[in-house]
Amino acid sequence: MVKRGKKTKYLFVTGGVVSSLGKGLSAASIGALLENRGLEVQHLKLDPYINVDPGTMSPFQHGEVFVTDDGAETDLDLGHYERFTSAKMTRRNNYTTGRIYQNVIQRERRGEYLGKTVQVIPHITDEIKAVIREAAGGADILIVEVGGTVGDIESLPFLEAIRQMKYDVGEENAVYAHLTLVPFIAAAGELKTKPTQHSVKELREIGIQPDLLLCRSDREIPRDMKDKIALFCNVDPSAVFTALDVPSIYEVPLSLHREGLDDKLAELFNIWSRAPRLERWETIVDKVKNPRRGEVRIGIVGKYVELHESYKSLNEALVHGGIANDARVKLAFIDSTKLEEGDLSDLDKVDAILVPGGFGIRGTEGKILGVKYAREHKVPFFGICLGLQMAVIEMARNVLGLAGANSLEFDEQTPHPVVTLMEGQKGVTDKGGTMRLGAYPCALKEGTKARALYGADLVHERHRHRFEFNNDYRAQFEAAGMVFSGVNPDLGLVEMIELPGQHFVGCQFHPEFRSKPFAPHPLFAGFVKAALEHRDAQQRQPSAEVKKLPVGKNG
């Protein structure tokens, strides 16, 4: 094999049969394997929907919006890419059909096409190829994930563009990986390959012959069945891999490595690389599977609890907090709208309470009840973005005695707008891409819990909001005991709050976007630690039943 040069090689990941097979995790895991072989890896996600970005889409439809340092609102798969590799995502790492068409139409309006009829081929496909090359950024390998399912009409321009790329860059500089489903039919008692055969047939009709197949299955696919898939799909038998269901997503790179996927990619790319070093991944998986400090229950009080993908980065950041404390974090999703009905029993069953970000008035009173419960019962509390604002409103009403206190987002007539619209947001009418987005500095106050957790005076965190704490009320809150432990040094905006005497922390930013399994975010590590301490303290206390036992003669 030749030693790798500076020319970028491209791996295109497509999916077939059904959606939600795990293309993003597969792409991220491949990135982790290649990076651990000493290669520089970058990622690109191509989404076929017409929205310019996912920023205005419902979490129920799209899942989480992942925010990058440069303020891009992107697909949640970019979170997987950042968590699994050292690559830093920016707005150039996620393109949608809407954004591609927007670029082309703007060029047409500027007259850059010199009077030509602008068409899908070549103009749209050329634009797609241009953003693919731009995303590479000089990396050894660019992994391009094409969203959607092969056969969807929306994906066709992207598939045509990646078909052309192999001819543009050369055979050994472009590899096609196709993720399919090999289901086990319980009634027949066997795995079925027909869905995979049909999916590959559809891909080949478009003009793309996959170089390797990742076959998602809940069990190992035997060698003879892999040979059958290879025969009918015109793929080398050594290029058919089981993408096995595993208990933890952090086991996926190890599972694919055991299948020999990274060796095959090195062969297909004809690229030199060292032997993979996966000890860190093995350690992480061991900590996830065999925590020495047992299990801790974290209650997430939100309104998107039916779809856990809505809080993807948050969920993983809590897992990372568990890794940092050698504990397993069990998430209990608590519907805030149900709390409004008066049943708070779910809050009794958790060791800590977290109120995440969100938008809109629905469920906010339930979140405020969750905050009140945590404050009054000394249960560790962590409020993120809207969660901080809920904590402020709860304290204003129940400690400061400011009746009717609220956020201007929910009540424009509130007598006490303790949460107000940011100055820079006044007059903004467009919804897409207009919030306070991206990384901003936060100066931490000496002697606070926030300063102790971070171990730094100044940090940078990612934001996604329009509303902020109203500094007109700051003196009243400080007099009541609230500590403003983090402030934006440029604008004086409140970034962090806390209450002394308990683990009660709120932040206006989204720390979950910066957490990784190998580098758990300090706020999540500290939160899980506090939850463990609360759990242990509760277990040491005698139960109510024991307290009621009659005292004996020797008592």
From Swiss-Prot:
It is an enzyme of class 6 (ligase). One of its GO terms (biological process) is 'de novo' CTP biosynthetic process. Pathway: Pyrimidine metabolism; CTP biosynthesis via de novo pathway; CTP from UDP: step 2/2. This is CTP synthase. The gene is pyrG. Homotetramer. The active site is at residues 385, 510, 512. Mg(2+) binds at residues 77, 145. Belongs to the CTP synthase family. It comes from the Bacteria. ATP binds at residues 20-25, 77. Pfam families: CTP_synth_N (PF06418), GATase (PF00117). GO terms for cellular component: cytosol.
